[in-house]
Amino acid sequence: MRIAYLVDKRSVGGGMEYVRRQIAAHPNDECRVFEADRGECTVAAMNAWGAEIVHANHLKALLQLFRNPFARLGGYVVFTVHGIHLRRFDFLPNTPANLVKRWARLSLERYLYRKCDRIVALTETDAADIHRLYGRHLPVAIEPNSIGRSTLRSAEGLRYGEGQFAFVCIARFEFQKGQDVLIKAIARVHETLRRLEKKTLFIGGGPFLRHIRCLAEELGVSDLVEFAGEIYDAGVYMTCGRTLIAPSRWEGMPYLLLEAVARGRRIIASDCPGNRDVLKDYSLSTMFPVEDVSSLAEQMQSAD
Protein backbone atom coordinates (compact mmCIF):
# COMPACT_ATOMS: atom_id res chain seq x y z
CA MET A 1 0.00 0.00 0.00
CA ARG A 2 1.20 3.52 -0.76
CA ILE A 3 0.78 5.99 2.11
CA ALA A 4 1.48 9.69 1.57
CA TYR A 5 2.25 11.73 4.69
CA LEU A 6 1.57 15.43 4.23
CA VAL A 7 3.39 18.02 6.39
CA ASP A 8 4.00 21.75 6.13
CA LYS A 9 7.77 21.17 6.18
CA ARG A 10 10.30 18.75 7.60
CA SER A 11 11.11 19.93 11.10
CA VAL A 12 12.31 18.75 14.50
CA GLY A 13 8.93 19.16 16.22
CA GLY A 14 6.36 16.72 17.52
CA GLY A 15 4.36 16.63 14.29
CA MET A 16 7.30 15.30 12.31
CA GLU A 17 8.15 12.88 15.13
CA TYR A 18 4.59 11.55 14.84
CA VAL A 19 5.08 11.01 11.10
CA ARG A 20 8.38 9.20 11.64
CA ARG A 21 6.73 6.86 14.12
CA GLN A 22 3.79 6.28 11.79
CA ILE A 23 6.16 5.32 8.97
CA ALA A 24 8.08 2.98 11.28
CA ALA A 25 4.78 1.27 12.15
CA HIS A 26 4.18 0.44 8.45
CA PRO A 27 7.35 -1.45 7.43
CA ASN A 28 5.58 -3.36 4.67
CA ASP A 29 4.01 -0.30 3.05
CA GLU A 30 5.56 2.24 0.72
CA CYS A 31 5.57 5.57 2.56
CA ARG A 32 6.61 9.02 1.39
CA VAL A 33 6.59 12.48 2.96
CA PHE A 34 5.25 15.44 0.95
CA GLU A 35 5.90 19.05 2.02
CA ALA A 36 3.42 21.89 1.57
CA ASP A 37 6.20 24.49 1.64
CA ARG A 38 7.56 22.88 -1.53
CA GLY A 39 4.14 22.76 -3.20
CA GLU A 40 4.02 18.95 -3.07
CA CYS A 41 0.69 18.42 -1.28
CA THR A 42 -1.61 18.60 -4.30
CA VAL A 43 -4.21 16.24 -5.67
CA ALA A 44 -2.18 15.97 -8.87
CA ALA A 45 0.92 14.89 -6.92
CA MET A 46 -1.05 12.32 -4.89
CA ASN A 47 -2.70 10.81 -7.97
CA ALA A 48 0.57 10.79 -9.92
CA TRP A 49 2.31 8.88 -7.14
CA GLY A 50 -0.66 6.56 -6.71
CA ALA A 51 -1.32 7.31 -3.04
CA GLU A 52 -3.94 4.97 -1.58
CA ILE A 53 -3.97 6.72 1.80
CA VAL A 54 -3.27 10.44 2.13
CA HIS A 55 -2.44 11.25 5.75
CA ALA A 56 -2.26 15.00 6.37
CA ASN A 57 -0.65 16.26 9.57
CA HIS A 58 -0.81 20.03 9.21
CA LEU A 59 -3.64 22.35 8.23
CA LYS A 60 -1.45 24.07 5.63
CA ALA A 61 -0.89 20.74 3.88
CA LEU A 62 -4.60 19.89 4.03
CA LEU A 63 -5.50 23.28 2.58
CA GLN A 64 -3.07 22.77 -0.29
CA LEU A 65 -4.56 19.34 -0.95
CA PHE A 66 -8.12 20.68 -1.26
CA ARG A 67 -7.28 24.06 -2.79
CA ASN A 68 -8.81 23.06 -6.11
CA PRO A 69 -12.43 22.04 -5.36
CA PHE A 70 -12.80 20.41 -8.79
CA ALA A 71 -9.78 18.08 -8.53
CA ARG A 72 -10.70 14.46 -7.78
CA LEU A 73 -8.46 12.61 -5.35
CA GLY A 74 -8.11 8.85 -5.69
CA GLY A 75 -6.90 8.13 -2.13
CA TYR A 76 -8.54 7.88 1.30
CA VAL A 77 -7.87 11.05 3.33
CA VAL A 78 -6.89 11.02 7.01
CA PHE A 79 -6.14 14.17 8.99
CA THR A 80 -4.46 14.03 12.41
CA VAL A 81 -5.19 17.02 14.63
CA HIS A 82 -2.02 17.92 16.55
CA GLY A 83 -3.77 20.33 18.89
CA ILE A 84 -6.70 22.64 18.15
CA HIS A 85 -4.99 25.88 17.18
CA LEU A 86 -8.27 27.78 17.20
CA ARG A 87 -7.61 27.90 20.96
CA ARG A 88 -5.11 30.67 20.24
CA PHE A 89 -8.02 33.11 20.12
CA ASP A 90 -8.90 32.26 23.73
CA PHE A 91 -5.78 34.22 24.72
CA LEU A 92 -6.25 37.23 22.45
CA PRO A 93 -8.38 40.36 23.02
CA ASN A 94 -11.95 40.18 21.68
CA THR A 95 -11.36 42.92 19.13
CA PRO A 96 -13.43 43.01 15.92
CA ALA A 97 -10.32 42.01 13.95
CA ASN A 98 -9.65 38.96 16.14
CA LEU A 99 -13.30 37.91 16.06
CA VAL A 100 -13.26 38.03 12.25
CA LYS A 101 -10.00 36.06 12.13
CA ARG A 102 -11.42 33.42 14.46
CA TRP A 103 -14.60 33.11 12.38
CA ALA A 104 -12.56 32.83 9.17
CA ARG A 105 -10.30 30.12 10.59
CA LEU A 106 -13.21 28.20 12.08
CA SER A 107 -15.09 28.31 8.76
CA LEU A 108 -12.03 27.16 6.82
CA GLU A 109 -11.32 24.30 9.22
CA ARG A 110 -14.95 23.15 9.12
CA TYR A 111 -14.80 23.06 5.32
CA LEU A 112 -11.53 21.10 5.28
CA TYR A 113 -12.49 18.66 8.04
CA ARG A 114 -15.70 17.73 6.24
CA LYS A 115 -13.71 16.72 3.16
CA CYS A 116 -11.71 14.13 5.15
CA ASP A 117 -12.67 10.47 5.32
CA ARG A 118 -11.28 10.18 8.84
CA ILE A 119 -10.06 12.59 11.52
CA VAL A 120 -7.65 11.43 14.21
CA ALA A 121 -7.70 13.12 17.62
CA LEU A 122 -4.85 12.38 20.01
CA THR A 123 -6.89 12.88 23.19
CA GLU A 124 -10.48 12.58 24.37
CA THR A 125 -10.43 16.32 25.09
CA ASP A 126 -9.58 17.17 21.48
CA ALA A 127 -12.11 14.65 20.14
CA ALA A 128 -14.90 16.28 22.16
CA ASP A 129 -13.85 19.76 21.05
CA ILE A 130 -13.61 18.73 17.39
CA HIS A 131 -17.21 17.52 17.52
CA ARG A 132 -18.32 20.64 19.40
CA LEU A 133 -16.57 23.12 17.11
CA TYR A 134 -16.62 21.47 13.70
CA GLY A 135 -19.62 19.14 13.61
CA ARG A 136 -21.12 16.24 15.56
CA HIS A 137 -21.20 14.03 12.47
CA LEU A 138 -17.46 14.11 11.76
CA PRO A 139 -15.74 10.67 11.66
CA VAL A 140 -13.36 11.19 14.60
CA ALA A 141 -11.17 8.42 16.01
CA ILE A 142 -9.09 8.74 19.19
CA GLU A 143 -5.56 7.39 18.76
CA PRO A 144 -3.26 8.56 21.57
CA ASN A 145 0.45 8.99 21.03
CA SER A 146 2.64 6.54 22.90
CA ILE A 147 6.32 6.01 23.53
CA GLY A 148 8.30 3.10 25.01
CA ARG A 149 11.49 3.15 27.05
CA SER A 150 13.19 0.91 24.50
CA THR A 151 12.99 3.71 21.91
CA LEU A 152 14.64 6.35 24.11
CA ARG A 153 18.05 7.68 23.15
CA SER A 154 20.84 7.25 25.68
CA ALA A 155 21.92 10.47 27.41
CA GLU A 156 25.53 10.22 26.28
CA GLY A 157 27.71 12.69 24.40
CA LEU A 158 25.40 15.64 25.02
CA ARG A 159 26.44 19.28 24.97
CA TYR A 160 25.53 19.67 28.64
CA GLY A 161 25.91 17.43 31.66
CA GLU A 162 23.13 15.50 33.38
CA GLY A 163 21.32 17.76 35.84
CA GLN A 164 23.58 20.71 34.97
CA PHE A 165 20.57 23.06 35.02
CA ALA A 166 17.78 23.30 37.56
CA PHE A 167 15.20 23.56 34.79
CA VAL A 168 14.95 22.80 31.09
CA CYS A 169 12.30 23.92 28.60
CA ILE A 170 12.26 22.23 25.18
CA ALA A 171 9.89 23.58 22.56
CA ARG A 172 9.63 25.57 19.37
CA PHE A 173 9.57 29.28 20.21
CA GLU A 174 6.05 30.42 19.38
CA PHE A 175 3.09 31.92 21.23
CA GLN A 176 1.50 28.52 21.87
CA LYS A 177 4.47 27.20 23.85
CA GLY A 178 4.42 29.93 26.51
CA GLN A 179 8.13 30.60 26.99
CA ASP A 180 7.17 34.20 27.81
CA VAL A 181 5.25 32.92 30.84
CA LEU A 182 8.36 31.06 32.01
CA ILE A 183 10.65 34.08 31.59
CA LYS A 184 8.22 36.21 33.61
CA ALA A 185 8.11 33.53 36.33
CA ILE A 186 11.91 33.51 36.49
CA ALA A 187 11.86 37.30 36.86
CA ARG A 188 9.24 37.07 39.62
CA VAL A 189 11.61 35.02 41.86
CA HIS A 190 14.96 35.98 40.36
CA GLU A 191 16.61 36.73 43.71
CA THR A 192 15.85 33.26 45.06
CA LEU A 193 16.85 31.52 41.83
CA ARG A 194 20.08 33.50 41.68
CA ARG A 195 20.93 32.72 45.32
CA LEU A 196 20.26 29.01 44.80
CA GLU A 197 22.05 29.06 41.42
CA LYS A 198 18.98 27.71 39.62
CA LYS A 199 19.38 28.35 35.90
CA THR A 200 17.03 27.40 33.05
CA LEU A 201 18.11 25.87 29.74
CA PHE A 202 15.94 26.72 26.72
CA ILE A 203 16.16 24.47 23.66
CA GLY A 204 14.46 25.24 20.36
CA GLY A 205 14.20 27.70 17.52
CA GLY A 206 11.34 29.59 15.93
CA PRO A 207 9.76 32.99 15.35
CA PHE A 208 9.33 33.79 19.06
CA LEU A 209 13.01 33.25 20.00
CA ARG A 210 14.17 36.83 19.44
CA HIS A 211 11.25 38.15 21.49
CA ILE A 212 12.07 35.80 24.38
CA ARG A 213 15.74 36.78 24.36
CA CYS A 214 14.75 40.46 24.47
CA LEU A 215 12.25 39.78 27.25
CA ALA A 216 14.94 38.08 29.36
CA GLU A 217 17.22 41.10 28.90
CA GLU A 218 14.42 43.57 29.60
CA LEU A 219 13.51 41.79 32.86
CA GLY A 220 17.14 41.46 33.93
CA VAL A 221 17.35 37.65 34.02
CA SER A 222 19.72 36.92 31.13
CA ASP A 223 22.20 35.45 33.61
CA LEU A 224 19.59 32.91 34.74
CA VAL A 225 18.87 31.47 31.30
CA GLU A 226 20.78 29.83 28.49
CA PHE A 227 19.54 29.45 24.91
CA ALA A 228 20.94 26.36 23.18
CA GLY A 229 19.16 26.85 19.86
CA GLU A 230 17.51 24.14 17.82
CA ILE A 231 18.79 20.60 18.43
CA TYR A 232 17.74 17.49 16.53
CA ASP A 233 16.21 14.78 18.75
CA ALA A 234 16.19 17.31 21.58
CA GLY A 235 14.09 15.23 23.97
CA VAL A 236 17.13 13.53 25.48
CA TYR A 237 18.34 16.95 26.64
CA MET A 238 15.63 16.93 29.30
CA THR A 239 18.19 14.97 31.34
CA CYS A 240 20.31 18.15 31.48
CA GLY A 241 17.73 19.74 33.76
CA ARG A 242 16.56 18.42 37.10
CA THR A 243 13.00 19.48 36.26
CA LEU A 244 11.32 19.82 32.86
CA ILE A 245 9.02 22.82 32.48
CA ALA A 246 6.22 22.81 29.88
CA PRO A 247 4.39 26.18 30.03
CA SER A 248 2.23 25.77 26.90
CA ARG A 249 -1.07 27.57 26.40
CA TRP A 250 -2.47 24.52 24.59
CA GLU A 251 -1.18 21.22 23.18
CA GLY A 252 -2.25 18.14 21.26
CA MET A 253 -0.58 15.19 22.98
CA PRO A 254 3.06 16.24 23.34
CA TYR A 255 5.71 13.60 22.73
CA LEU A 256 8.04 15.56 24.99
CA LEU A 257 5.89 14.89 28.05
CA LEU A 258 5.38 11.26 27.05
CA GLU A 259 9.17 10.91 26.86
CA ALA A 260 9.59 12.68 30.20
CA VAL A 261 7.16 10.25 31.82
CA ALA A 262 8.97 7.29 30.23
CA ARG A 263 12.28 8.61 31.59
CA GLY A 264 10.81 9.25 35.04
CA ARG A 265 11.64 12.97 34.99
CA ARG A 266 10.20 15.61 37.31
CA ILE A 267 7.80 17.90 35.45
CA ILE A 268 6.15 21.27 36.03
CA ALA A 269 3.50 21.85 33.36
CA SER A 270 0.60 24.14 32.57
CA ASP A 271 -2.83 22.64 33.12
CA CYS A 272 -3.84 22.85 29.45
CA PRO A 273 -5.43 20.32 27.07
CA GLY A 274 -2.76 17.82 26.06
CA ASN A 275 -0.53 18.34 29.09
CA ARG A 276 -3.42 17.43 31.37
CA ASP A 277 -4.20 14.28 29.38
CA VAL A 278 -0.61 13.01 29.62
CA LEU A 279 0.10 13.88 33.26
CA LYS A 280 -3.21 13.20 35.03
CA ASP A 281 -1.88 10.00 36.67
CA TYR A 282 1.84 10.86 36.82
CA SER A 283 3.08 11.33 40.39
CA LEU A 284 6.29 13.24 39.55
CA SER A 285 4.43 16.17 38.01
CA THR A 286 2.82 19.34 39.30
CA MET A 287 0.61 21.64 37.26
CA PHE A 288 -0.18 25.35 37.29
CA PRO A 289 -3.06 27.29 35.69
CA VAL A 290 -2.33 28.38 32.12
CA GLU A 291 -0.48 31.74 31.98
CA ASP A 292 -0.35 31.91 35.81
CA VAL A 293 3.10 33.44 36.32
CA SER A 294 2.84 33.55 40.14
CA SER A 295 1.92 29.87 40.48
CA LEU A 296 4.74 28.78 38.17
CA ALA A 297 7.22 30.99 40.04
CA GLU A 298 6.21 29.45 43.38
CA GLN A 299 6.69 25.94 42.03
CA MET A 300 10.11 26.85 40.62
CA GLN A 301 11.15 28.23 44.02
CA SER A 302 10.21 25.03 45.82
CA ALA A 303 11.54 22.58 43.21
CA ASP A 304 14.52 20.45 44.25
Q: Where is each model-derived feature located?
A:
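A conserved mid-protein helix/loop that constitutes part of the nucleotide-sugar donor-binding site
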Residues: G14-R21, F165, C169-E191, P207-R213
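Short His-centered aromatic/hydrophobic patch
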Residues: A56-L62, V81-I84
